[in-house]
C-alpha cells in the first residue's frame, strides 16, 4: 500500500488552513504528525478521507481517493477522531462490530466469526471481559481503546488517528500505539496526530512537522542524528535538547529536555 499526497490545500469556507502539502506513506509504517494547536493536523486527516473539500491529489496505490464510492473508501481508509460521536446505549462488543459494516451487504448482520474477531480485538486492546458493558459507562480512555478495536477488525489499508493518546495514561499511550504497529504488519500504514513529541519519537517510524498549515520537514527517529532531529523539532517547539538513553530493559529511548 502506498499513499501519495500531492500539493494538498484545504480549509473551511474562505479560510485556507493547509498550504500545498505533499508527502508519501508506505506500507508497514506508522507516521506521526506533529504541530502546535491550529497547525492543521486535524484538517489534514479530514481532507485525506474526503470530509473536507480540497485541491491537490490524494492517491492510494495510484488510485485517486475521490473516485472511490463511500463504501469502497470506508474499506480502504479508517479515521479515529478525537470524539467517537456515539451517544446511544450500546455494548462495547456492538461498537466493535461496527467495524465490519463496510464489508456487510444490505440487511446483513455480523456472523459468529466476526463476533469472535471483535472479542479478540477487545482483548488485544486491554478490554477483554467488557464485551457487554455499556459503551457510555466506559472511561474516556476505554472508549478510545474500544474505537481502536473497532478499527482493527475493519482491516483498512490506511489507518488515521487524531490524538488517540489524549485520554490515556502514560502506559496506555504506549500500549495503544504498540497495538497499532502490530496491526499494521507489512500491508497497512498509519498516520497519527500526536501532542506528545517524545511519545511520537519512540513509537513512530517517521514524523511530519506542521506549522501554520505548511509541512516544514520530516524526520526518522531510528535513522536521523540527534543534531538533525533537534534542529527539525525546534522549528515547531523552539530550542530543545534530545538525548538517547537506555530504559531498564536496555532498549534505547529518546528523551526531550527543554
Protein language model features and the residues they cover:
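Conserved ABC transporter NBD signature motif
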Residues: 56-64, 73
Amino acid at each position: 500500500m502506498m499513499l501519495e499526497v500531492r500539493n494538498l490545500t484545504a480549509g473551511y469556507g474562505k479560510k485556507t488552513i493547509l498550504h500545498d502539502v505533499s508527502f508519501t506513506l508506505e506500507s508497514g509504517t506508522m507516521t506521526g504528525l506533529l504541530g502546535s494547536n491550529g497547525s492543521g493536523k486535524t484538517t489534514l486527516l479530514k481532507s485525506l478521507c474526503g470530509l473536507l473539500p480540497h485541491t491537490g491529489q490524494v492517491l492510494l496505490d495510484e488510485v485517486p481517493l475521490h473516485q472511490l464510492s463511500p463504501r469502497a473508501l470506508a474499506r480502504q481508509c479508517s479515521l479515529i477522531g478525537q470524539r467517537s460521536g456515539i451517544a446511544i446505549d450500546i455494548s462495547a462488543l456492538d461498537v466493535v462490530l461496527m467495524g465490519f459494516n463496510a464489508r456487510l451487504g444490505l440487511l446483513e448482520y455480523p456472523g459468529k466469526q466476526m463476533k469472535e474477531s471483535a472479542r479478540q480485538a477487545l482483548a488485544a486492546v486491554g478490554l477483554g471481559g467488557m464485551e457487554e458493558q455499556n459503551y457510555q459507562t466506559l472511561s474516556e480512555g476505554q472508549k478510545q481503546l474500544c474505537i481502536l478495536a473497532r478499527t482493527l477488525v475493519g482491516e483498512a489499508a490506511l489507518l488515521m488517528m487524531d490524538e488517540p493518546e489524549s485520554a490515556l495514561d502514560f502506559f496506555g499511550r504506549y500500549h495503544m500505539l504498540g497495538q497499532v504497529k502490530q496491526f499494521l504488519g507489512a500491508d497497512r500504514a498509519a498516520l497519527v496526530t500526536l501532542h506528545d513529541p517524545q511519545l511520537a519519537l519512540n513509537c513512530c517510524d517517521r514524523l511530519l512537522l506542521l506549522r501554520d498549515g505548511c509541512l516544514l520537514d520530516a524526520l526518522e527517529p531510528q535513522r536521523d542524528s540527534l543534531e538533525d532531529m533537534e534542529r527539525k523539532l525546534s522549528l515547531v517547539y523552539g530550542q530543545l535538547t534530545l538525548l538517547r538513553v537506555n530504559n531498564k530493559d536496555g532498549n534505547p529511548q529518546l528523551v526531550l529536555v527543554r
